[in-house]
């Protein structure tokens, strides 16, 4: 699906910019010179949320209350409505969306809001085999204060498929990206891991990529068939805090995680 795969970048005061997939992995960290770091603090706060195409009331108040203090906001099913774009450009230096498919008015897909400009951006898409609709993912890279580069993967996994072949296929190019990156990684989003086979495929992928799963003490994540759908995986970082915000502003509850960029725990 590379032909129709691209990201749209929204920056305050500038026209939206279309970004095509990079030609090679060699461009990771070389596409742009590192600018301001993602965080000047000793912590990185992220919010991960399937925002349900902003179909419910209060989604904006949730973002304003919990997203504005985050260095990264990873949204799934984000529609580029004027309200969302205005919030993103007013509170973040960059907002990158990968349109999975175009709805009557606004494209919908994963969207990453960041407190720093990414030095690398790779949009990805995979088509649902049954509904023929696409799901998207986005790989971005940001400089950290310690000169390392943080890779961030925002993913909305395919939902309706027989078996796990297409599910695993969507993870393959993400694995290629991680394999060519030596720094810390955060991979998060709606993984639609509602079956045992999907969970096993996801956990196997995480192990192969040396990614650890963020654990939530009061685990109020959205579930299907008793299994959580939303996850945060990481490497090269420490988890300081992790919580789930219970809200009716979407059919998913946002995940709030704070990382410290020091050396990870053994």
Curated annotation (Swiss-Prot):
GO terms for cellular component: cytoplasm. The lineage of its organism: Bacteria, Pseudomonadati, Pseudomonadota, Gammaproteobacteria, Enterobacterales. It is found in: Cytoplasm. It comes from the Bacteria. This is UPF0294 protein YafD. Transmembrane segments: none annotated. One of its GO terms (molecular function) is catalytic activity. The gene is yafD. The keyword Glycosyltransferase does not apply. The keyword Metal-binding does not apply.
């Amino acid at each position: 699906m590379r032909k129709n795969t691209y990201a749209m970048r929204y920056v305050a005061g500038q026209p939206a910019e279309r970004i095509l997939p990079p030609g090679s992995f060699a461009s990771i960290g070389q596409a742009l010179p590192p600018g301001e770091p993602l965080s000047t603090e000793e912590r990185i706060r992220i919010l991960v949320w399937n925002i349900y195409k902003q179909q419910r009331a209060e989604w904006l108040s949730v973002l304003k209350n919990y997203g504005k203090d985050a260095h990264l906001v990873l949204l799934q099913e984000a529609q580029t409505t004027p309200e969302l774009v205005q919030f993103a450009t007013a509170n973040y230096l960059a907002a990158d969306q990968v349109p999975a498919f175009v709805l009557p008015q606004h494209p919908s897909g994963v969207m990453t809001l960041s407190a720093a400009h990414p030095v690398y951006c790779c949009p990805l898409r995979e088509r649902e085999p049954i509904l023929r609709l696409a799901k998207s993912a986005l790989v971005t890279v940001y400089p950290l204060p310690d000169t390392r580069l943080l890779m961030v993967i925002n993913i909305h996994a395919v939902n309706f498929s027989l078996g796990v072949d297409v599910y695993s296929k969507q993870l393959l190019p993400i694995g290629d990206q991680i394999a060519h990156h030596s720094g810390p990684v955060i991979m998060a989003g709606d993984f639609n891991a509602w079956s045992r086979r999907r969970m096993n495929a996801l956990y196997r992928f995480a192990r192969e990529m040396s990614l650890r799963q963020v654990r939530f003490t009061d685990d109020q994540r959205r579930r299907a068939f008793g299994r959580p759908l939303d996850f945060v995986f990481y490497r090269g970082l420490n988890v300081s805090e992790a919580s789930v915000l219970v809200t009716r502003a979407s059919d998913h509850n946002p995940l709030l995680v704070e990382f410290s960029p020091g050396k990870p725990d053994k």
